[in-house]
Each structure stands twice: as C-alpha cells, then as structure tokens.
C-alpha cells in the first residue's frame, strides 16, 4: 500500500488554478526557529480569510503568500515579516511549522491588491488576520516586495479546515492529509511496487474513496506521478465495478480537476462538490471508486516471471542525473553533439523538472533544485530558460534558450523525482551507533526457509558497498566503511553472518542487488567484531581534473639522474632507473600540470587522521594519502606500458573561487584536504609530477589519470574521476589530444575515441 502526504487546497472555481502558483529561493538568514505553541487569543473581530501559496513551484509546500479577503486574492508585503508570521501562515494551511521565508518577490510578483503590510505576529495567533498590520489594503509596497514562505512537510494531525467564508468558496476548503493507491485485486496485493487500485484520500483521520463520476485520465496521470510512475494505463473496469457492487464505500465529498501536468495532486483544482442522492444519501450513487493503473519505469518493473504487465520503456535518454545520493535525484545533464553538459536554473520549476523525471522512468518531480545543490558540473551549459507544458516526452522538446550568457556552473539545475515505494529500507538497518546515521549493518535475509536478521561479513567491505547501504536507507552518502565494529553493540539476536562476499558496482538500489555468496556463506574471520559497518552523511565531495590544462601543459624533459635522487628514493622512476648511471644517465619524463577541483557539496578529506600521515624528507612535508592519483600510459589495448610516477600526495587548497576561503595547507603540519569551491594544483615542474617514459617505444597510446583510484574517500560521483587522452609519441616529441573527463562523452562518441587511429591536425595526418 502506497501512502504520501499532500497539502491543503484552498481554491475557487472562479480563480486561477493553483498549478501556476509557487516559490523557489531559500534564505538561510530567515531559517526556521522552533515555532511557538499556539495559545488561545483574546476574542476580537477577526475576519475570515483564506491563504494559499502561489508562484512558480519548486516544491508543493512553498510559495508566495496570498490572502483571500472580501472576494479578492491579494499578496502580503515583506516589511516587518518574520518567522513568527511564517509559522502562522503554514499552520493556517495545515502544516506544523515553517522552514523559512523569502522577501522581495522571490516567488515571482503577484497581481492585484497587496492586502497586508508591516505584519507583526507573536507566533501564537490562529490566523495571519489576527496579527498586527497597517490594516487591510493600507500599504506603500509594490509587488516586488511580495513575501513567500516554505512550510515543513509535517502535517497537523486532525487539522480541521474552516468553511465559514460565504459565496463561491463555500465548501471548497478541502484538507487532504494523505493519498494512497490501495490494491484491490489479489493479483496486485502482494506486488511491489503497488501499481493499481482504488484512489483513496485521508480526511480528518479517515480514509475515503474518490468517486469516479468526474475522474479523468489526467487525474490518474498526476496520481501515478506522485507515486513514482511515469504514466497511467488502461485497466479492466468491469472487474472493479463487479467488486464495488458488493462493497459499501465511504466517499470523499469532492472531486478533483487536474490538467495532467501538475507534479502533485495538491496543485489540482477542486472540481466540485458531490451532492448526495436524496433517496440513498450516497454522494456517488451513479458511480464507483476511482481506479488508477500505473506503468512503472524499467528499473522498477518486477521480473517477467511474476506475470507483470508491460513496463514503461523510454528510448535512449538524452538526459541523465549526476551527483545525487538517492535513486531519482541529481544534477540534470543533457547530451548535445555527443557531449554531456548541464542546464541553467533560470525558469527552472516543477513542471519542467517533471518532464526530466518521466523521461528517465520516474514519476513527477518532488523538488526542482536551483543553485547547484547537487554539485557543479564541468564543460558546457547546453540549455537555459527552459519552459515545458508538462506533456513533452523529452526535455529537448521544450522551449529553451541555446545561449547560456550570464549562467555559470553555480546555477546548475537539479531535481528530486518521486520514485516507487519498493520497501528496500525495510531490508537493512544500522545497529549500535551513536546516532541513526551510523552503526553495524544488519540485513534481513532468508535462511533455512525463514527471514532473519544478521550481520554482513566485512572481508570484501568497502566504500562502494557502504554507499549502497546509505542509499537504501535514504541517509545520503557513506562517509566511512568499517571492517571492524566491536565498539558498536548490535542486536544480540542478529550476531550471525547472513551475507558474505558482497561486491557492489555503485548503481544498485539495495545491498541484495549486489553480487554476494547467497546461501553459501564464506567468512573466514567470522562476524562479531569483524561485521561490516557504515557511517552516512548528507553531502559528499566530488573531485574532477581539469582535462584542458593537462592537454595544454604536456611536454617532454630529459632530466639527468643526478637531479633525480629524491625522486628515485620515492620510486617516481621506472625500475630501469636502478641500472642507469647516476652521473651520466638521464630519464625521459612526460611532464604536465594537474588541477583537481572539488565540485561537490563537502570538503575532500584524507581517510586517515594526522597520526597516520607519512613524513617525506625530500619534500619536507607530510603526505596524507599514499594512493591519491594514478598516472598511466596505456597501449591501445589497455596494457600499462610505463611506470614511475607520483603516487603519494599532500592535499591543500592551492586556489579557490572568489567567495571561498582557503582552509587546508601542507606547510607546518597543517590540516590537509580540498575545500568545496577550491582546487589543488600540481605544477608540471614539481618533483614526481610526471610519467617516466624512458623505456617506451614510439607509437599511439592512451594517457590516463585516475583520482582517488581505490575509492578510499567517498564521493558523490566516481565516473568523473577518470581523465583520458589520446597520445602520439614519435620518439622525440609527444602530442596529447582529445583529453576529456570520464562520462563527458556519449557512448557512441567514446567508442570513436577508443578506435580513432590517428591525430587529425597540421602536425600529423591520419594513418
């Protein structure tokens, strides 16, 4: 059974649909303080009003504050507005409290009257109409000062809506606490996810069916989208009519009227009030409960053996998500001319974001994120000012501006999509930790015909496996993967090892999807103190190499051996250097500069603490990571042909963006790492910043750099840790070309890169 929360609909048949209303920016300076408990206020002449959230939506529970007074909707000025006032607005809409408020029409400018100015609340009022103000319609503000709020997701239990306004809005103040798809037919009751059944809404604590008399396929599309499904499909209505005729139903007294492009049922208009039949007193005497049947995306369709119907099959997508911790979220990237690039967040909203989600096989968008909240991309910004109507099959079918002047990667758009409830979070738990985001990993597995909780063998346990656990639990990224957990007292009834040999690729949605030994448990060290553990965090770093700089700075140097004593000691040279004369010999070095950016949402810190760092006498500083980057020269079949290069590193902030302060430095035993928005530079002329190619024959090669190769430190994206170039060496000169980051090309373009036989420019011709 699927359940989700939606918010108060305050609507009129004569006013515009709420689908066009909403908000976007988040202001930390107006972040939520704890909301005061509402207390009874002295009785006075307080007018009855309605409140709604308007503007371009990036989340359904935020927007420009609009008030319905004396038959007209109007806005509220931001002068003297406070978190107390924001709490009152959200409570009036049925939410427990506010998260933040935003001034200066950040949700867009409203129209018509500005009803309230200089609003002064103490946090205990029942309505914003009870707060102090200049009086109704008394203001010197313009709509550029319209205020907006963001409410929490938590609803007030049993919240009752006032229906005391006369006129057209009478009876249309509907509170829908939750909505669900309740599987009715036996064929769907045990299936995960639930894709077909009655649409039911929870009103004042009771579940009620929705009458199908005014139900449309557009309504079904919205409901399916809320539950993580990209589309609706037809179903056998005769079976449901037969079932309904044998049951007594309690109906919701209203109908919904959706356009089909809403990201949430809360954005639909109320269609009308269902009048009870005078004879039967039933509100849906000529109908039956509304039914939806949804098509799941490919990743969520049950296996063919279950007899499941057809699943939604999207074509090869021209859009992808990167940098998100959970399935269905990430920075939006689009493919153009064989190269992936980002999109600018100008005009980015829920409707447009929902097109992306559905294109990828998810439901509608839960949240449209602006300001690179899923990390910054690299390369081109392919699209900006995108405007969709919500029914496009692909983002590229929407109207957009191909020019991105004024945009930078700090404005990269991202999305969180609604995904089906698969129940994966119920199959794993963390036990014994100091807080809910850490602990010994315990999994629910079938052993000897029964389901039982047990531990995971840590012999093959690493960061990638820990990442899957954190994703499965919805806890973000893994900050650490522990192979010993003796300090965490787990459940004594779950001490036995029930899973071993776990190896994950990083794309799985649950630990059970990773390769493992199944029922053949093989754990030489046993469980107990060697059971696997994790620690999860909300954000992670993302290291990316500047590929263009590598291509621009590459050159060869013949360096005498007597100048390479320190490098020789640190094994930065090929093993043949041991046989080279220290006085007359030399080494041929492929030199280049590297610039490693942290484009993520958290600082990159070494895995080990300062007590484990190694002092390098030649360089006169500590190296915090012995294996931070690999520099490799490969033959065209992928064989390594050169050895001798920099291995251990000291990590620091060499340079930063203008608004970012340096935090890490190698000097004076300082803290090491790379701050978000900073980069660590290794110039071409520093010791060991090379590959020793003395023994390499002339020919065509691949040059490859891999950052964090052992994945010792968790990152939001490992695909961009690899940089690869084509390379031609004629015995005297070297050419580096087509340098690019892993994942920046389409599959087809990458294959052409792998098989391209020569360099096409005025220096060397194609063979």
Swiss-Prot record:
GO cellular-component term (any): basement membrane
Family affiliation: Belongs to the lysyl oxidase family.
Cofactor requirements of the protein: Cu cation; lysine tyrosylquinone residue
GO biological process: collagen fibril organization; endothelial cell migration; endothelial cell proliferation; epithelial to mesenchymal transition; heterochromatin organization; negative regulation of DNA-templated transcription; negative regulation of stem cell population maintenance; negative regulation of transcription by RNA polymerase II
Cross-link (Lysine tyrosylquinone (Lys-Tyr)): 646-682
Enzyme kind, highest EC tier: oxidoreductase
E.C. number(s) listed in UniProt: 1.4.3.13
Role according to the record: Mediates the post-translational oxidative deamination of lysine residues on target proteins leading to the formation of deaminated lysine (allysine). Acts as a transcription corepressor and specifically mediates deamination of trimethylated 'Lys-4' of histone H3 (H3K4me3), a specific tag for epigenetic transcriptional activation. Shows no activity against histone H3 when it is trimethylated on 'Lys-9' (H3K9me3) or 'Lys-27' (H3K27me3) or when 'Lys-4' is monomethylated (H3K4me1) or dimethylated (H3K4me2).
Residue numbers carrying 2',4',5'-topaquinone: 682
Localization of this protein: Secreted, Extracellular space, Extracellular matrix, Basement membrane; Nucleus; Chromosome; Endoplasmic reticulum
Residues with glycosylation annotation: 281, 448, 637
Listed Gene3D superfamilies: SRCR-like domain
GO molecular function: calcium ion binding; copper ion binding; oligosaccharide binding; protein-lysine 6-oxidase activity
Keywords: Basement membrane, Calcium, Chromatin regulator, Chromosome, Copper, Disulfide bond, Endoplasmic reticulum, Extracellular matrix, Glycoprotein, LTQ, Metal-binding, Nucleus, Oxidoreductase, Repeat, Repressor, Secreted, Signal, TPQ, Transcription, Transcription regulation
Location of region: Lysyl-oxidase like: 541-744
Protein name: Lysyl oxidase homolog 2
Organism listed in the record: Xenopus tropicalis
Binding annotation for Ca(2+): 542-543, 715, 717, 720-721
Residues annotated for Cu cation binding in this entry: 619, 621, 623
PROSITE patterns attached to this UniProt entry: LYSYL_OXIDASE, SRCR_1, SRCR_2
Annotated disulfide bonds: 77-141, 90-151, 121-131, 211-284, 224-294, 258-268, 344-407, 357-417, 388-398, 457-523, 470-536, 504-514, 566-618, 572-688, 650-666, 656-678, 725-739
Domain SRCR: 51-152, 181-295, 319-418, 428-537
Processing after translation: The lysine tyrosylquinone cross-link (LTQ) is generated by condensation of the epsilon-amino group of a lysine with a topaquinone produced by oxidation of tyrosine.
Family matches, as InterPro entries: LOX-like_protein, Lysyl_oxidase, Lysyl_oxidase_CS, SRCR, SRCR-like_dom_sf
Signal sequence region: 1-19
Cofactor note: Contains 1 lysine tyrosylquinone.
Keyword Methyltransferase: no
